[in-house]
Amino acid sequence: MKRMKLRTNAGPLQGTIQVPGDKSISHRAVILGAVAKGETRVKGLLKGEDVLSTIQAFRNLGVRIEEKDDQLVIEGQGFQGLNAPCQTLNMGNSGTSMRLIAGLLAGQPFSVKMIGDESLSKRPMDRIVYPLKQMGVEISGETDRQFPPLQLQGNRNLQPITYTLPISSAQVKSAILLAALQAKGTTQVVEKEITRNHTEEMIQQFGGRLIVDGKRITLVGPQQLTAQEITVPGDISSAAFWLVAGLIIPGSELLLKNVGVNPTRTGILEVVEKMGAQIAYEDMNKKEQVTSIRVVYSHLKGTIISGGLIPRLIDELPIIALLATQAQGTTCIKDAQELRVKETDRIQVVTDILNSMGANIKATADGMIIKGPTVLYGANTSTYGDHRIGMMTAIAALLVKQGQVHLDKEEAIMTSYPTFFKDLERLCHD
């Protein structure tokens, strides 16, 4: 088996980086553009494999989507403009694509089969199946947990519902709201903790109406959406890898340009500042929720990460775990059981990989206890098909002074950051 040999024993990282477009916003721009009336143009779209799965799904549903002058142009025909697909919709590795598109197709008068790759086929869909069934959709997966493939028969006469989310999940909330846009009457979604709010913001950007009152979102349907011009900011979840690298590699100084800082996504910035990180914000645009972040190597101390903070940094927890291995003292991550049903069981995989490199991490049912600082050594590892695990391991390898780090299945990183290794090499040489 050929494994990728990762760069180790890096000197200070220096330079400026523009991370790819935000994955969450890219998905939603395509989804809402596909059912809005008129021509939607998207600048800065992430061209990773997950977003390409969403684009291909809508092409299969009869929507015309093409690239023109470095923009994605979507010819939306409204909610009535989708056609029954001639084939199965393949969502690849993308849980966002499957869950949000299932919500959207809930109000369509045709049936569809949705499949995914081996990793997606192990991710539970019961969380969207139950609320969509309550709205009148025939939808089912495999076993009680409703694993993909999903079979869905839409319903033009969807019923509005009031639904309290049993878990903190922006994907479930979004699936219900996309269905609610096609249901006659008032749908309410009540969250456990506030999760990323891109769907709510972008529905309004496309001319939709909803009311957000704390953890309660109210939407009266049916509604029509109008095409927009969207500019996608850099993805804070991708910027997180360089943020951490800059903080833990001695002598580093990096400028991360044009990073989206929607407040429902900035948990990682609060955590690293609490741990003692030296970071500064430049060219902050509060209206567009975009800033550049300057980061320099810092001496860090352990912290506790729990409660309402978790949904605001759920995707950044693997790289935060690496950060904690280099901080003085104990870092405790709690209330993060959702990590166990991501692309991998991220609690177990992060613990196993970093411990194999010399870290001191104890996995718990809902998180990790990490003692630092520890020296990291070479190891043979794998992404296990999880892009964020792959990038975490590549940043960890930069700290290794003894031994080699080999990574299997590195192609998983294409999911969200196709130019990751190119950017890494540049920062090591600037």
Swiss-Prot record:
Question: Does Transferase show up as a keyword for this record?
Answer: yes
Q: Which Gene3D superfamilies does the UniProt record give? A: Enolpyruvate transferase domain
> Which pathway is this protein assigned to?
Metabolic intermediate biosynthesis; chorismate biosynthesis; chorismate from D-erythrose 4-phosphate and phosphoenolpyruvate: step 6/7
The chemistry this enzyme catalyses reads:
3-phosphoshikimate + phosphoenolpyruvate = 5-O-(1-carboxyvinyl)-3-phosphoshikimate + phosphate
Which EC number applies?
A: 2.5.1.19
Record's keyword annotation contains Disulfide bond: no
**Which EC class heads this enzyme's classification?**
transferase
What is its biological role?
Catalyzes the transfer of the enolpyruvyl moiety of phosphoenolpyruvate (PEP) to the 5-hydroxyl of shikimate-3-phosphate (S3P) to produce enolpyruvyl shikimate-3-phosphate and inorganic phosphate.
State the family named in the UniProt similarity comment for this chain. Belongs to the EPSP synthase family.
Protein name as it appears in the record:
3-phosphoshikimate 1-carboxyvinyltransferase
Q: Where does this protein come from, organism-wise?
A: Streptococcus pyogenes serotype M2 (strain MGAS10270)
Q: Which gene encodes it?
A: aroA
